[in-house]
From Swiss-Prot:
It catalyses: 7-carboxy-7-deazaguanine + NH4(+) + ATP = 7-cyano-7-deazaguanine + ADP + phosphate + H2O + H(+). It comes from Anaeromyxobacter sp. (strain Fw109-5). Its cofactor is Zn(2+). Belongs to the QueC family. This is 7-cyano-7-deazaguanine synthase. Zn(2+) binds at C197, C206, C209, C212. One of its GO terms (biological process) is queuosine biosynthetic process.
Length: 233
């Protein structure tokens, strides 16, 4: 009997809670996962080392880090140390405004890199861990953005023109953070290794930035112990 061809997918992996859960979902879905992390000049580079560990732990086929320096443009607290990372924002503020931690065009750039990697691999699937429920209000984490990028990929690539359009999977898009934590826990995600914090202190999560607040909320609402060591209790 002929061997069935391997299903390959590129998984954007930051080393945080969402993207790591997304990797576990891709593996559950039967894909050979090719993880792509991007060093875009972020101040929280510690996540890249976590991503490598997590890719191995969850059985990825490989893990690649690509450098694209978005800090050259500035404009975000995540790439410019002169801009303070907001701490202690309320849920109402998160819903009402786009914070200074938004990195201009970041997800457009990351998905473009994933698209290029997928096309060279002969993969037709990309997984991304964006979320539009418990999130910081970024415009490039919304369903309309993902649909638009998928259409772009169809007309912008050799594969798409030849009738093999790219599929973008965003399995966490409409889950609460608690739902994401429950899903990842059921799939064996080692959350103690993940790092979500925007402003870590000597490798430890600050406990007060948007990412930490949402992470803590997710574990609390899921009723699952949070293994994270926070600087601010």
């Amino acid at each position: 009997m002929a061997k069935r061809p391997t299903k390959r997918a590129v998984v954007l992996l930051s080393g945080g809670l969402d993207s790591t859960t997304c990797l576990a979902v891709a593996r559950r879905d039967g894909f050979e996962a090719h993880c792509l992390s991007v060093d875009y000049g972020q101040r929280h580079k510690g996540e890249l080392a976590r991503a490598r560990r997590l890719s191995r732990a969850l059985g990825a086929a490989d893990h690649r880090v690509v450098k694209v320096d978005l800090s050259a443009f500035g404009g975000s607290a995540l790439t410019d140390r002169a801009i303070a990372v907001p701490k202690g924002r309320s849920g109402r503020r998160r819903a009402a405004e786009i914070p200074v931690t938004y990195v201009p065009a970041r997800n457009t750039v990351l998905l473009a890199l994933a698209l290029a990697h997928a096309e060279t691999l002969g993969a037709e699937d990309v997984y991304v861990g964006v979320n539009a429920i418990d999130y910081s209000g970024y415009p490039d984490c919304r369903p309309a953005f993902l649909r638009a990028f998928e259409r772009l990929a169809t007309v912008a690539t050799k594969a798409g023109v030849e009738g093999r359009p790219l599929r973008i999977h965003a399995p966490l898009l409409r889950l609460t953070k608690a739902g994401i934590v429950r899903l990842g826990t059921s799939l064996g995600v080692p959350y103690r290794v993940t790092l979500s914090c925007y402003d870590p202190v000597r490798g430890r999560a600050c406990g007060a930035c948007d990412a930490c607040v949402l992470r803590r909320k997710g574990f609390a609402e899921a009723g699952i112990p949070d293994p994270t060591l926070y600087v601010q209790k």
